[in-house]
């Protein structure tokens, strides 16, 4: 899919719990390599070894960032091969192991006696992390409910037929026929993390045509983007579809690599975009007098949602600390020779193509 190096997320906390697209990512590649049986430390070393080899050989690499740990990888892809940390909660499945999916197992790469001796500590940290993550999910679900109430309030004074008409006009202007069968690639440009809602702008920077939909409440942008996606599919274009990390049923961004064109949503969590993009204020399809009447309620809900989001970030920090403690124990129990063998095997697999 990638014509240049690019970075995305593939999963993270959303309303209702964890939501990921790792299976969809693995299914895009001829040779999915699943790294099983360990925590982020072991899988991270394998992924980094492969990334460095591919970068040194001048290959374009798509890296998948970890939403739980800044600076760590969850997966990467290059040509027909991808590598995925397949531990929970990612857990893509090997349907035809060895025939299709290649599996790298970390189970034998740890000192069993050491881990058994740390069983109680590992259990305590794991349970603590799970409790914190569930608490974060509850806070996020409550915040999403308030944001949804705002969206519904704005929808009552929004003319969706005008939004659809705008989507069709944008499609006519920016989306040309490709004459092929396009594919939809599910990715995330932002994720809910312990540091807030993080946004990855690198994939947007080289885009030649950027259209920003200013939509604070998410009432119109999703409708416009759905129309654009439908027209792009009919015209055979490849699509990178980026849902909202908080409310996965809502589209936030669409990227069309073949056209170097993107339509993105701007709100308080990601409002700054590079260059001088065209900006469309979605209030143009809303009745402004209706928005003014509801302004006080909208502000109150938004303020309460922000307070709940602060609790989300705090709970995710607790969950992250617990996970780091577990990772540290597993990292100390690694058998270096076994990890090195897995890294070498991963490098061999990175040279496979669709014909093998």
Language-model features, listed with the residues they occupy:
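An accessory alpha-helical subdomain
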Residues: 121-178, 297-345, 349
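N-terminal low-complexity, Ser/Thr/acidic repeat segments characteristic of secreted
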Residues: 31, 176-182, 209, 347, ...
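Internal, well-ordered alpha/beta segment that forms a basic, Gly-enriched binding/recognition surface
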Residues: 97, 101-137
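Glycine-rich phosphate-binding P-loop
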Residues: 31-52, 197-198, 206-232
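A cross-family "folded-core" feature that marks the main globular domain of proteins
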Residues: 35-36, 46, 62-63, 96, ...
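N-terminal pre-Walker A segment at the start of P-loop NTPase domains
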Residues: 1-24, 161-202
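Conserved nucleotide-sensing/catalytic segment adjacent to the nucleotide-binding pocket
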Residues: 2-18, 25, 30, 51-114, ...
């Amino acid at each position: 899919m990638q014509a240049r190096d690019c970075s995305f997320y593939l999963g993270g906390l959303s309303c209702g719990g964890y939501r990921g697209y790792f299976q969809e990512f693995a299914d895009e590649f001829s040779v999915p390599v699943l790294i099983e049986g360990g925590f982020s430390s072991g899988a991270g070393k394998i992924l980094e070894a492969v990334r460095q080899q591919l970068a040194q050989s001048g290959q374009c690499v798509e890296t998948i960032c970890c939403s739980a740990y800044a600076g760590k990888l969850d997966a990467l892809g290059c040509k027909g091969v991808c590598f995925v940390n397949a531990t929970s909660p990612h857990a893509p499945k090997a349907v035809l192991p060895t025939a299709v999916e290649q599996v790298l197992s970390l189970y034998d790469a740890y000192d069993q006696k050491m881990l058994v001796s740390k069983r109680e500590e590992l259990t305590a940290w794991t349970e603590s992390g799970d409790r914190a993550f569930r608490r974060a999910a509850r806070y996020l679900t409550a915040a999403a409910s308030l944001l949804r109430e705002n969206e519904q309030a704005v929808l009552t004074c929004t003319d969706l037929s005008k939004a659809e008409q705008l989507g069709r006009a944008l499609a006519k202007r920016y989306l040309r026929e490709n004459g092929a069968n396009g594919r939809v690639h599910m990715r995330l440009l932002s994720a809910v993390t312990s540091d807030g809602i993080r946004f990855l702008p690198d994939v947007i920077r080289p885009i030649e045509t950027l259209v920003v939909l200013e939509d604070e409440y998410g009432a119109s942008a999703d409708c416009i983007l759905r129309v654009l996606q439908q027209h792009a599919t009919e015209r055979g274009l490849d699509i990178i579809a980026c849902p909202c990390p908080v409310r996965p049923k809502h589209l936030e961004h669409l990227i069309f690599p073949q056209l170097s064109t993107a339509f993105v949503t701007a709100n308080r969590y990601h409002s700054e975009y590079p260059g001088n993009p065209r900006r469309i204020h979605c209030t143009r399809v809303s009745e402004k007098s209706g928005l003014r009447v509801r302004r006080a309620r909208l502000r109150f809900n938004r303020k309460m949602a922000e307070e709940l989001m602060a609790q989300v970030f705090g709970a995710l920090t607790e969950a992250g600390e617990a996970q780091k403690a577990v990772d540290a124990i597993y990292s100390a129990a690694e058998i270096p020779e076994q990890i090195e063998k897995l890294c070498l095997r991963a490098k061999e697999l990175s040279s496979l193509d669709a014909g093998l």
